[in-house]
């Protein structure tokens, strides 16, 4: 029977944590897929099973699932809850020396590439959707381009760990994914403001907004990282030091949001500072061990919960025949846009990039989309336009994680790490 009253935060948390724990056990015990992919596959199958039972007249299960999901604000859970910790945990183990070495491809792909990809996807969608009876205003297509273009660090970094990609390519993909989600969120929020107000901002306003939110987030993250570094260096007690990192992440993200700065970029910068300078100069071996262990567990647990939620949310989407075909073409459009951005970058700057020959294959296929895209599309105003974009977003995200995520390792193995990019 479906819930008849609102559940408390504790009850909702208990339900989803229990589901996640059970699915991770089933995956580890019987299936053996990477955890994030495995739990999402199982949760999708459960959702499809509930839908099928609903068609047969047994609709209690799907009613309960829908009612439960409606009481959960996915956008708030991810953007205001999980994201800060996941980004910090990811950046904590990224070598800043490697980032500096590959700063050119990371910078181009994360900043320019995100904007170019958003424009390409928006234009293609604008002309493709009317063929299937789903014409959308160009601004809505731009919103979709902005939310689907960033590669998701949560999805990318979890899968790259076991993909076998050459170190240089792994660094570029991980570095790009850590930064471009912040850029994508800023662009999305800017476009959403235009949609809500109906006013078209000037170029100066757009540039100022991007500079304040993105640039301010980076500077704020560096300041937070410096403060945290000096606090960690002044004591030697792993319990307090772990607590300081947790407080810095949650409190810092809240402050960044309050001051309208990019919280994601702030967390990335703070994670890089603590994970590099802090790890080398401000932590004892014992503290380093416990901080690494704590954030590894946080990363694994939150990732598992996130991908379970993505799988369960499938029941909220209604696909028609034409929309299903349009979703398939949208997957192709997203991949082609990614290929063009990566191809232009590697072709134009191949002498400066210092990447293995054929790196474009992994950079293209390894550009996974994930929970951030879902969280952003759920922020759109309710209506027919949002329903269309929600279906398209889920198609791209699920294909990205299941198909690209499971096969990117094979693509990576085809790259010889000792050869440099000469040409696509």
How should each PLM-predicted stretch be described?
Residues 1-424:
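Transmembrane helical cores of multi-pass secondary ion antiporters/exchangers
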């Amino acid at each position: 029977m479906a819930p008849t009253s609102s559940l408390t935060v504790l009850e909702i948390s208990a339900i989803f944590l229990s589901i996640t724990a059970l699915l991770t056990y089933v995956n580890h015990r019987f299936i053996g897929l990477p955890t994030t992919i495995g739990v999402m596959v199982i949760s999708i199958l459960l959702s499809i099973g509930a839908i099928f039972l609903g068609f047969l007249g047994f609709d209690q299960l799907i009613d309960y699932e829908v009612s439960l999901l409606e009481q959960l604000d996915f956008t708030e859970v991810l953007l205001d809850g999980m994201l800060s910790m996941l980004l910090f945990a990811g950046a904590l183990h990224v070598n800043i020396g490697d980032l500096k070495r590959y700063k050119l491809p990371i910078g181009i792909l994360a900043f320019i590439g995100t904007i170019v990809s958003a424009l390409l996807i928006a234009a293609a969608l604008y002309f493709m959707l009317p063929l299937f009876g789903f014409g959308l205003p160009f601004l809505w297509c731009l919103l979709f381009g902005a939310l689907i273009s960033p590669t998701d660090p949560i999805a990318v970094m979890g899968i790259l760990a076991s993909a076998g990609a050459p170190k240089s390519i792994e660094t570029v993909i991980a570095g790009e994914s850590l930064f471009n989600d912040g850029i994508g969120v800023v662009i999305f929020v800017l476009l959403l403001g235009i949609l809500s107000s109906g006013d078209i901002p000037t170029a100066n306003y757009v540039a100022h907004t991007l500079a304040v939110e993105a640039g301010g987030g980076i500077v704020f993250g560096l300041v937070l990282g410096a403060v945290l570094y000096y606090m960690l260096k002044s004591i030697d007690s792993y319990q307090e030091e772990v607590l300081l990192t947790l407080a810095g992440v949650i409190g810092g993200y809240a402050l960044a949001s309050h001051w309208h700065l990019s919280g994601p970029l702030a967390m990335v910068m703070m994670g890089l500072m603590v994970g590099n300078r802090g790890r080398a100069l401000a932590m004892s071996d014992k503290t380093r061990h416990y901080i690494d262990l704590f954030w590894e567990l946080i990363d694994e647990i939150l990732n598992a919960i996130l991908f379970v939620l993505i799988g369960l949310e499938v029941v909220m989407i209604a696909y028609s025949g034409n929309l299903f075909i349009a979703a398939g073409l949208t997957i192709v459009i997203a991949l082609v846009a990614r290929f063009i951005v990566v191809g232009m970058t590697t072709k134009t700057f191949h002498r400066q990039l210092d990447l293995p020959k054929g790196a474009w294959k992994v950079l293209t296929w390894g550009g996974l989309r994930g929970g951030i895209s879902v969280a952003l599309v759920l922020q759109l105003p309710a209506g027919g336009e949002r329903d269309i974009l929600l279906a398209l977003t889920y198609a791209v995200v699920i294909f990205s994680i299941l198909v690209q995520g499971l096969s990117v390792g094979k693509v990576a193995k085809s790259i010889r790490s000792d050869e440099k990019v000469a040409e696509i």
